[in-house]
C-alpha cells in the first residue's frame, strides 16, 4: 500500500508541510512511542531518539534504527523517481537494514530536502505544491493532531 503525501511550502514559517492524502491517512489513532499512529496493525519497528530530527509525516520506519523500508519516493504527477537518482537510495536503505555503514539519518533527511527543493527551484513552480507517493512500505504514516506535519528547511 502506498502512502500519499501532500507537500507544500509555507513561506511565512519557512517550513515544508507534509500532509497525508486520501484513505491512507484515515484510521483509528493509537498511541505509540512515536506519538499517534493511524493503525495498530503496523508492525513494530526499532526506534531511535528522533528529537533532533526535523523530518515529519513519514512512515514509522523512517525513524527506525534499521532505516526506512520504503524504496520509492516519487512525484505522482510525473511518476518519476526523485530520490533514487544520484545516490541510489534503495542500496543505501538496504545497507542500513543490514546494519552496514551507509548514509546517516541526518544525511538522509538532508537528501530528501535537497531533492524536493531542487525540483521546485529548477522547474520554477510557483505554487510549490506536489503530491508524492511513498511506496513499498507496510508501515503507516505518523499522524499527529496538529494540522500539519513539518519538516523544516533550516
Curated annotation (Swiss-Prot):
One of its GO terms (cellular component) is host cell mitochondrion. Residues 68-117 are annotated as: Mitochondrial targeting sequence. Keywords: Activation of host NF-kappa-B by virus, Activator, Apoptosis, Host cytoplasm, Host G2/M cell cycle arrest by virus, Host mitochondrion, Host nucleus, Host-virus interaction, Modulation of host cell cycle by virus, Transcription, Transcription regulation. It is found in: Host cytoplasm; Host nucleus; Host mitochondrion. Pfam families: X (PF00739). A fraction may be phosphorylated in insect cells and HepG2 cells, a human hepatoblastoma cell line. Phosphorylated in vitro by host protein kinase C or mitogen-activated protein kinase. N-acetylated in insect cells. One of its GO terms (biological process) is symbiont-mediated arrest of host cell cycle during G2/M transition. It comes from the Viruses. Belongs to the orthohepadnavirus protein X family. Multifunctional protein that plays a role in silencing host antiviral defenses and promoting viral transcription. Does not seem to be essential for HBV infection. May be directly involved in development of cirrhosis and liver cancer (hepatocellular carcinoma). Most of cytosolic activities involve modulation of cytosolic calcium. The effect on apoptosis is controversial depending on the cell types in which the studies have been conducted. May induce apoptosis by localizing in mitochondria and causing loss of mitochondrial membrane potential. May form homodimer. May interact with host CEBPA, CFLAR, CREB1, DDB1, E4F1, HBXIP, HSPD1/HSP60, NFKBIA, POLR2E and SMAD4. Interacts with host SMC5-SMC6 complex and induces its degradation. Interacts with host TRPC4AP; leading to prevent ubiquitination of TRPC4AP. Interacts with host PLSCR1; this interaction promotes ubiquitination and degradation of HBx and impairs HBx-mediated cell proliferation. This is Protein X. The gene is X.
